């Protein structure tokens, strides 16, 4: 399974992004194959913050449309939200201090 980064999500969503065609084609290909892929929650948050931001885009995506885009992706049977478990902080801390 692969995780899709914020940059791919933004480029695929925004038709005015310079790499829209490539990113959109990549996501469409993943969808057509039906291979499992993941949306990390931090990337979902970053996507929402980016595409709706008026300082980034002259015509930002309305929040409702951005939420619908994420909802469509998460609604696909082969897309999985990716999150850390409850032990994440303890494991990270132990690895960094070891």
Regions found by a protein language model. Give the residues of each.
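Short, solvent-exposed helix-to-loop capping segments enriched in aromatics
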Residues: 69-77
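Short, well-structured N-terminal submotif of metal-dependent ribonuclease cores
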Residues: 1-39, 54-69
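Active-site neighborhoods of divalent-metal-dependent phosphate/nucleic-acid chemistry enzymes
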Residues: 60, 76-98
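A general structural signal for well-ordered alpha-helical segments in protein cores
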Residues: 44, 66-70, 89
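Short, conserved alpha-helical segments within structured domains
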Residues: 39-44, 84-88
